[in-house]
Amino acid sequence: MKCSADVLIVGGGIIGCSIAYFLRKQGAEVIVLEKGDIGAQASSAAAGLLAPIRPLCQRDPFKVLQLAGLVRFSSFVPELEAVSGITVGYEQTGTLRLLPAEKLDAVQAWAEVWQHAGYHIEVLTPQEAYTRQPNLSSGLYGAVTIAEEAQVVPVQLVQAYAQAALNLGALLYAHTEVVALQRSERGSRITGLWTNQGDLLTCNQLILAAGAWSARCGTWLGIKLPVRPVRGELIALEQPSLPVRHIIFDEGIFDEDIYIAPKLNGTVVVGATKADVGFDTSVSAGGVLHLLTVATQLLPALAHCPIHRMWAGLRPKTPDSRPLLGPIPSWENVVIASGHGGFGVLLSAITGEMVVELVTTGTIPEIIRPFVPKENIVDEVNSHKREDAQGI
C-alpha cells in the first residue's frame, strides 16, 4: 500500500471518485479511501436522473449549480467514456411533468421566462399530454415537458469515474476505514490518517466526500457536520406493453417526490420515498405500497407489470437541503464535498471540477461560495480537536 499522496479523499462514492478523476487530470497524487466497496452506497442506489427543472422553480444559487451540472454532463460524458472505457447510459429522455390544478395559472408565465433563457420547455394541454404518453390516467389538468433533462445508469457512471481515475494513476483502496488522524504540531492541519489496516497515510490535503457518513468525519475534527442519512426506496418494474417514453414526474397531484423513469434495460424505475431511519437500508412494505399506489394512479398499466427488483439507498442530507462544498473552518487543509441529497449524480462532474479548482488554486469558485461551511459549525468536542475517529 502506497502511504503518501498529495490528496487523500475519504469516500469512494460518485463524488469522491469524480474528484479523484479531476485531480489526476491536474497531475496530483491521489488516494481514495472507502470503507466498503467503491460506489456501493448512494451512488449505486440512485435512479440516475439529471432533472432539476421543476415547474415554478426559481434560479437561486442551488438551482444555478444544478443547471451548471446539467449543462456540464452533456459535454463531459464522451470524455469520461473515452478515458474509462465504460458507457454510462446517458439518455436525453426529456421529462413529462404532470401538474396539479393549482399550478396551472402560474406555469405559463414561468415557462416563458425559462424559454427566453434558452430551455426547450412546453406547456401541454391534457390532450397533448396524452399524445406524448397515451396510457396516462384520465383526468389530467396539464403538463410540462423539458427536453434538456436526461438520465444515466448510476452504477455505470460511478464505475466510469472510478476506472477513469485508476487509468490516470489514482489509487482507490476499498474496505479501508479511517480510525484516527494525525495533526501538525500547531493542530490546524491534517498530516495523515490511520486506517484499519494499520497504515498511516500522509497527505498535504484532505477531502471529505463520505456522503451520508460525513457527520462521523466531523467527530475527528471537533466539529458537527450537519449531514444525515435519508433513506430512499425504489422499485423497478418491467415495461408495460405500451412503453413509458419519458421520465414522468408527479408535480403535486398525489406526491411530488414520485417519478417514473424508463430505463435502457427494459424496466421502469419508480422512486422515491424519503424516510429518516438512520442507516437502515431495508425496503419497507409501506414504502413499496406508497410507490406502487402513486405510480399506478398516474399510469394504471403499471399495475399489471412484473416487479423486477426493489432496493433502497441513503442520501446525504443537510438541514437546508443544500450541499456543503469548500474549506472546513479552522482547518487549513480540509475540504468537504457532501450533502448533495438526491442530486449527487447530477452534481458529480461540476462538484469534481470546482473542488479541484479550489484545491489546486486556493481560490473558492464563485458558483460554490454559497455552499461553503460557515464559521458557526458547532464545536462539539473541545478546542484542542480530537485525534481519535470512528471508522467510516
List each language-model region with its residue ranges.
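N-terminal Rossmann-like FAD-binding beta1-loop-alpha1 element of flavoenzymes
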Residues: 5-31
